[in-house]
């Protein structure tokens, strides 16, 4: 299983890439969210990958963030969703937008994606509910409360608090608060709980 590729980006043709790793060129398909954030050709790139082995092909899919790869893997577990469809979902909306759509059970938002009809959207909502990680949907909502929600959450997790406790505490942090002040406010909220 190939889990990570680091090398020189040789070609970029949406959604395909060619990455040279010590003289071996790997063809990798990426969602557009990853494609738009890639360096220029000739520069070094590091991608997290998902290898899919079929009877007729060995395919690599690449992602810049662990959240994208995890979401891709969750999408593949859904009946009727293959790698191409999962890539289309991640190309059409961010992981946070998908998590919000699942949390709000917003099928209309998903049907705007190419290849996703009403029944597929409903199946996605049903099967992804609670599987994208509590932090994705809740953190998307908490991000409006604090610009540094991820950093604050990571600090709270490092201090031994659960993800659920951390997310609840972040909701008490006002927008525009710095990381250190946000951690103090979150800890204060946790001490009262």
From Swiss-Prot:
Classification via SMART domains: HhH1
Region named Domain III: 144-193
Domain I: region residues: 1-64
GO terms, biological process: DNA recombination; DNA repair
Region (Flexible linker): 139-143
Any one of the GO CC terms: Holliday junction resolvase complex
Swiss-Prot/TrEMBL keywords: Cytoplasm, DNA damage, DNA recombination, DNA repair, DNA-binding
Subcellular location: Cytoplasm
Segments forming a coiled coil: none
Pfam families with a match to the protein in the record: HHH_5, RuvA_C, RuvA_N
Origin: domain of life: Bacteria
CDD domains attached to this UniProt entry: UBA_RuvA_C (cd14332)
UniProt keyword Cytoplasm present: yes
Region (Domain II): 65-139
Family designation: Belongs to the RuvA family.
Purpose of the protein: The RuvA-RuvB-RuvC complex processes Holliday junction (HJ) DNA during genetic recombination and DNA repair, while the RuvA-RuvB complex plays an important role in the rescue of blocked DNA replication forks via replication fork reversal (RFR). RuvA specifically binds to HJ cruciform DNA, conferring on it an open structure. The RuvB hexamer acts as an ATP-dependent pump, pulling dsDNA into and through the RuvAB complex. HJ branch migration allows RuvC to scan DNA until it finds its consensus sequence, where it cleaves and resolves the cruciform DNA.
Oligomer status and interactors: Homotetramer. Forms an RuvA(8)-RuvB(12)-Holliday junction (HJ) complex. HJ DNA is sandwiched between 2 RuvA tetramers; dsDNA enters through RuvA and exits via RuvB. An RuvB hexamer assembles on each DNA strand where it exits the tetramer. Each RuvB hexamer is contacted by two RuvA subunits (via domain III) on 2 adjacent RuvB subunits; this complex drives branch migration. In the full resolvosome a probable DNA-RuvA(4)-RuvB(12)-RuvC(2) complex forms which resolves the HJ.
Protein name per Swiss-Prot or TrEMBL: Holliday junction branch migration complex subunit RuvA
Gene name per UniProt: ruvA
